[in-house]
């Protein structure tokens, strides 16, 4: 009976050690991926586009929260990778970065005429209130 308990405790300890090492490996891989993404030459444009999307979704183009986020992201990029230009990038990451700039959210800022067409075809329904009246859709009378 004691032998089975000892075996079970040994097996349980081994499982915990394996799980711990797997978690550490996953965290290391995640950190490597974050470093590769943030050192990519198009990373600054990715941040800029993301912040533009946040501006549209919030409806407040001069939001201090968004500006603080922009400052924080810029500082973290500078502090993490001061010499990022020498690092090689993968083709999958290159493809992602390039395709991101053709996303619907980017089109909102680059093509004002298609703003509503883009918003109507988002996979999720989004209620947006824009700052300027020319961007507000007419509401149905009840």
Curated annotation (Swiss-Prot):
Detected in inflorescences, seedlings, leaves, hydathodes, stems, roots, embryo and siliques. Expressed in a polar pattern in organ primordia and at the boundary of mature organs. Detected in the lateral domains of flower meristems, but not in the inflorescence meristem or the vegetative shoot apical meristem. GO terms for molecular function: DNA binding. Induction: Down-regulated by the AS1 repressor complex including HDA6. InterPro entries: KNOX1, Leaf_patterning_domain. Keywords: Coiled coil, Cytoplasm, Nucleus, Transcription, Transcription regulation. It holds the Pfam family KNOX1. GO terms for cellular component: cytoplasm; nucleus. GO terms for biological process: leaf proximal/distal pattern formation; positive regulation of DNA-templated transcription. PANTHER family: HOMEOBOX PROTEIN KNOTTED-1-LIKE 6 ISOFORM X1, PROTEIN KNATM. This is Protein KNATM. It comes from Arabidopsis thaliana (Mouse-ear cress).
